Amino acid sequence: MGIFTPPGKSDKRDANEEKPTLLGSNSKDETDVEKFWVRPSLGLKLWGPLVPASDNKTGLWTLVAVQSMVGLLCFYRFKSLRIIDRNGALNSVGKSGIRPTSVLVNEPKLYNSAFTQQEAVSGKPLVKKDIADFPTLNRFSTTHGDMFVNTTNVNRNTPSLSAAPVVASPVLSSAGHQSEIMAKSEAKNNWKSFFKSDNWLIFKKVFYLLAGSIILSQSMLEACRLTILRYDPWCEEAKTVREKKFFNNIVKFYHEGIDPTKVKVKDAVSGNIMPTNVPEVRQSVALVRAQTEAENPIISWFGPIEYKPMTFSEFLDRLEYHLDMFEYFQGKRAANETALGFLTGIKTETSNLRDQNAQNRSRILKELKSEDQLSNDLSIKTGNAKIPKGTQRHGFSAAANRSIILEEDVAVPEDIDLNEIWTLYDPWLNLALETSLSIKFIPTVLINQDGITENSMMDTEATIGDKAGVIPENSNKPEEPRQ
């Protein structure tokens, strides 16, 4: 929809000059007709241009359902024809097992030549009947006469004969006249006899069977496309084109503007009429117009009219590319899952090793405690008890925690090898390693050289003796017992 401005008043000459331009523009618009391309599908080609857009799932499923019903109807018709053919064959067989068409009636000798000629022409026998047996032919009289009926008019459902006479005359003038009448009657009933023949019935059965099979197979193919395919190139293309058309319409209607004589915009709050040249108003009106066009039944069914879908070969190429990429990413995902599983296995092994190490440490600690208990028991038996806790010997407590494990066969102290025990546990060596010495030189009063030397030596010996726990001999302090 565009803005239409009525032409102003002008003279006749100007109007005549503008006519060729208008005609030219109209002719251009007429020649520039938008083409319509049939929407693609796999199993709905029988519908021709009525196929909806590929993104219109509702329309596609509707046509699939209708087409499936038509196919089922064809199969139902085929089944009905088979039942009719079977019942007709059973009813037409008499007690002797011979169809009435194979029964030959001996005609009178008067008409043998004529009927023999007719049978030679048509190749079908005739049946002799009385006129009195047909009420429609003998309604107002009781005249009796012979009537010959062609056996091709036998009804398929009942063994009775139809009332379509070939010749009906009580007295025939001549055999030639009778054969002429029979030829004309047979020419008129030729098409009727064809539609009642077995060939026409066979043709209908084959037609309904093939039509039902083709229609149902096409419906199944389209249903598989709609359900199995996760990526449909036609559907994705139709969605993209529909969205582009919607946004292009918004831009188009925005630039076209608003005709104030046709459109009025009111404020939702105050109800006042707003000017149409405001950008916000133009944008809102353009959006509404685009939505209205998108909701058009024809656009909703077919999509954009000027949309040209991709060809079937391009559809197959895109589908193949999608499947290749899907397989590639599936391989990548499998490789990542394998790597994650490997890392998870490493974490599991690490946790198992951690638990195993904790168990080993607890087991070793338990064994050490049991060995300490065993050594304590042996020491008690031999009289070598451990130093009570809280007591110190030689200024350190490390010796109280040390223990010697004896063999099980040691029962008395004489069985212990003292040299080996001393080698393993040397108290003087441990004392030397664990004892730290601190030597301090403290100056004294200045006296003669001999006095300084003697006093220094005495201070040094006293310091060393204090560290070692020994009292010097020259000290005047009384000896105190050490603990």
UniProtKB/Swiss-Prot annotation:
Q: Is-annotated flag, keyword Transmembrane?
A: yes
Q: Name one GO biological process term.
A: protein quality control for misfolded or incompletely synthesized proteins
Q: What is its main location?
A: mitochondrion
Mitochondrial intermembrane face residues: 1-59, 223-483
Topological domains annotated Mitochondrial matrix: 77-205
One Gene Ontology cellular component annotation held by this UniProt entry: i-AAA complex
Name the domain of life this protein comes from: Eukaryota
Q: Enumerate composition-biased segments (Basic and acidic residues).
A: 9-20
The transmembrane segments are 60-76, 206-222
Q: Where is this region: Disordered?
A: 1-27
Membrane topology per record:
Multi-pass membrane protein
Please give the InterPro entries that the UniProt record associates with this protein. Answer: i-AAA_Mgr1
Its localization reads: Mitochondrion inner membrane
What Gene Ontology molecular-function terms does this entry list? misfolded protein binding
Query: Could you tell me the keywords of this UniProt record?
Result: Membrane, Mitochondrion, Mitochondrion inner membrane, Transmembrane, Transmembrane helix
Q: Which Pfam families match?
A: Mgr1 (PF08602)
Known function = Component of the mitochondrial inner membrane i-AAA protease complex required for mitochondrial inner membrane protein turnover.
**What family does the database annotate?**
Belongs to the MGR1 family.
Q: How does it assemble?
A: Component of the mitochondrial inner membrane i-AAA protease complex.
Q: What name goes with this protein? A: Mitochondrial inner membrane i-AAA protease complex subunit MGR1
Q: What would be the name of the gene that encodes this protein?
A: MGR1
